[in-house]
Amino acid sequence: MTSRLVRATSLTIAIMACQSEIGRSQVKLASWLDEPKPASWNKPGLPIPAAPRIQGNVDPRCRDLARPPQLEEDNRLRDQGWDLVGAYQGGWQILVIRGTASYDGMCRPRQYQDFVFVRGVFAGTLSPQAMDSRTDGALGRVSLQSNNRLTAEYERYFATDPLCCPSRKTSVVFDIANDASVLRPVSASTSSNK
């Protein structure tokens, strides 16, 4: 009985220690969203980033759900190793296309990114690093506002939030420079989901 209690206690302590580390790493990744005017990571003329290398194999059932390329921009993303996820958004000669490098066990995107193209030119990404579904800073909805503005909403988790239910969201307004096709964040605001 005592050895069972010791094992159960040790396991509980290990799980709690890992949970706090996971929460800390999520906060570090999404900290750019805490700035009222985030610094821009997009620069004119940058190439489309390659998909991150993933350890292990991707479940072929998830990969079968990827959208086939339809546009030249889709092909450019595929050439960099990205699977296309969901429908692209377009208007005002702007395209927003989501790509992922991998999937979780429920075929949700892991190591994904949203790419913005303006008049066929790569203008940048909607996050400074690839994101994982159901983690702090995961990109949700993107709304095209005009020919030079879009808004993106990011899920925000506290370490105590269940994975199903982020307690906050951060909306970031992005402008597209007219002189050079480059996407820049101009403001960020966080609100409660309650």
Language-model segments: which ranges?
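Bacterial N-terminal signal peptides that target proteins for export
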Residues: 1-9
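Bacterial N-terminal signal peptides
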Residues: 9-17
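Exposed acidic/polar residues on beta-strands and adjacent loops within beta-sheet cores, strongest
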Residues: 21-194
